[in-house]
Amino acid sequence: MQVYSGKSVFGGIAIGKISVYRKNEQQLKRVRTEDTKGELARYEAAKAAAIEQLQELYQKALKEVGEANAAIFEIHQMMLDDGDYNESVENIIETQKINAEYAVAVTGDNFAQMFRAMDDDYMRERAADVKDISERVLSILNGGQKGKVITDEPVIIVADDLAPSETVQLEKDMVLSFVTVHGSVNSHTAILARTMAIPALIGTEELPLDDTVDGKLAVVDGLNGKEE
């Protein structure tokens, strides 16, 4: 029997099959273009669509986890409207004459690194938020939807990490628990887990995310921070 340890976000015991959640891989290429106006227009359209999605998530979260917890999706909308973020994307498109996808990815990485370097714990957590909004815009630019956990039976979700948008879209009746390799007890995802009363562990760094665990029966001990 394998035992993996992590930090408990919400106490409780869960027993069930593991479902490994793999995020949609973004196909990112650096493509030169002379049509910078067209790329700027694509970015603006994708950003508008992302803000609309975030508003829908806010309304869903408002009903299910309350105004205080739903506020993260308002924060995400504000981050997408942030002047510095948008100026960075637009500047990269115009000066480097490249596609919108690449500009968004570079901007997201740069801003995430900036937040991670800050001394304040709360501000460091914003690195995950800026990556989340950037991935949402990238998904739209690539013609898809941002990842969503889908299952037809109650399972223990195991993932590298879960964004707040992915967490709030979990169908509580279908999720016995979730376990992530990375994450922080101060993250919005952890806060949402507590509010949704889902037993959860984070920081289970030795847990594999492959077929060796997918579909296997497991026990999540949210009281002692262990998965067996």
PLM segments and residue spans:
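Non-catalytic, soluble scaffold/interaction modules
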Residues: 1-228
